């Protein structure tokens, strides 16, 4: 199965609307999700593992939408969801080490930023470590 076929299948299965960014109130520069509207904006469909993982990560935000989560937890659960779907399709092993490091570091940086800002009872780094 090609990556574009997987992308289209997942978009249909999870009832995701795509937007070029013209419906956004904020001028976001990168791909992002609007969970209440089940919308992913500014995602470019390309037949690649990176494009597929980006889409799945944003759908992960939609599928794991919980306003009580901290940012690091939102990112962790969205990424973990994306990894799970990649595993279901048998393509998780195609995610590059660079991409893995980027997502993991982003989660841990969000955790550290929350703690620096006075947040308490944050998950440990071990609890936020992704299982690739």
Task: Report residues per predicted region.
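Residue signature of alpha-solenoid helical repeat architecture, marking inter-repeat boundaries
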Residues: 49-50, 73
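Long, well-structured alpha-helical subdomains associated
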Residues: 46-47, 88-132
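Active-site scaffold of zinc-dependent metalloenzymes
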Residues: 7-49, 62
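Post-HEXXH active-site segment of zinc metalloproteases
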Residues: 65-89
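Hydrophobic or amphipathic, alpha-helical segments that drive membrane association/targeting
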Residues: 19-25, 75, 81, 104-108
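A metal-dependent hydrolase signature that marks the N-terminal structural subdomain at the beginning
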Residues: 1-22, 80, 127-132
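Charge-rich, solvent-exposed alpha-helical interaction surfaces
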Residues: 6-10, 58, 85, 102
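Active-site recognition of the HExxH zinc-binding catalytic motif
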Residues: 52-66
């Amino acid at each position: 199965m090609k990556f574009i076929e997987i992308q289209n299948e997942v978009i249909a299965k999870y009832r995701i609307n795509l937007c070029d960014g013209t419906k956004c109130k904020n001028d976001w520069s990168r791909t992002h999700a609007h969970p209440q509207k089940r919308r992913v904006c500014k995602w470019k469909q390309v037949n690649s593992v990176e494009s597929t993982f980006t889409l799945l990560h944003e759908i992960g935000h939609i599928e794991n939408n919980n306003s009580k989560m901290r940012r690091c937890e939102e990112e962790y659960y969205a990424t973990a969801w994306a990894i799970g779907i990649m595993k279901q399709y048998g393509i998780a092993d195609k995610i590059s080490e660079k991409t893995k490091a980027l997502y993991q570091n982003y989660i841990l940086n969000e955790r550290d930023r929350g703690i620096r800002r006075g947040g308490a009872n944050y998950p440990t780094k071990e609890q936020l470590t992704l299982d690739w």
